[in-house]
Regions:
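An alpha-helical, amphipathic repeat domain used for nucleic-acid recognition
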Residues: 1-180
Length: 180
């Protein structure tokens, strides 16, 4: 246990986390180690982009400088790779039949830099991943709506395609082919 004089002599950083909750952390070398351990635990639980990891660590009460130092170190030793995370997330999104716009929104929501999200989405678009996802979505809605009026089938497909972020041109081609 420390005495009052020793406690008052330490530099203390406090940050507001919630509505009225304040987390107090001592600013010393142990803080960097604790932040690194917290970051590794978060990365063990699920892959994350550096932006999302940064938000989580700051919410836990670590200082901006400490968080930036830890993220830079994790990036340098290849434990944190935003590009690999973004590419993996694009595969996940296309597996859910999402389009380019929806995928970019999902990536930025998960803490990926907007420019990187656009670049990875452009690569996927050039490979035809989003086109394939739109066709798969069309096949799903063709099966689900079999027997319904053509106008109803098209409306439901267009609504789903719009929610998932597909371009109108792609949706038009798929609808003309599959939903007549």
């Amino acid at each position: 246990m420390i005495d009052a004089q020793e406690f008052l002599g330490r530099a203390v950083a406090a940050e507001t986390v919630g509505a009225a909750e304040t987390v107090v952390r001592e600013s010393d070398d142990d803080d960097v180690d604790a932040c690194r351990e917290a970051a590794l635990r978060l990365l063990d639980a699920a892959p994350r982009a550096s932006g999302a990891l940064r938000e989580r660590l700051i919410a836990k009460g670590y200082a901006d400088g400490v968080v930036d130092e830890v993220i830079e170190r994790l990036t340098r030793v290849h434990l944190l790779d935003d590009r690999a995370y973004a590419e993996s997330a694009v595969r996940y999104c296309t597996g859910r039949c999402m389009g380019r716009r929806g995928t970019v929104m999902e990536l930025t929501r998960k803490g990926v830099d907007r420019a990187l999200a656009e670049a990875v989405a452009t690569e996927a678009e050039q490979r035809g991943d989003f086109e394939d996802a739109a066709w798969e979505l069309g096949r799903q809605y063709a099966r689900k709506t079999r027997g319904l009026d053509v106008a109803v089938r098209r409306r439901r497909f267009w609504s789903a395609g719009g929610r998932k972020g597909h371009s109108p041109e792609t949706l038009r081609r798929v609808a003309e082919e599959l939903l007549n």
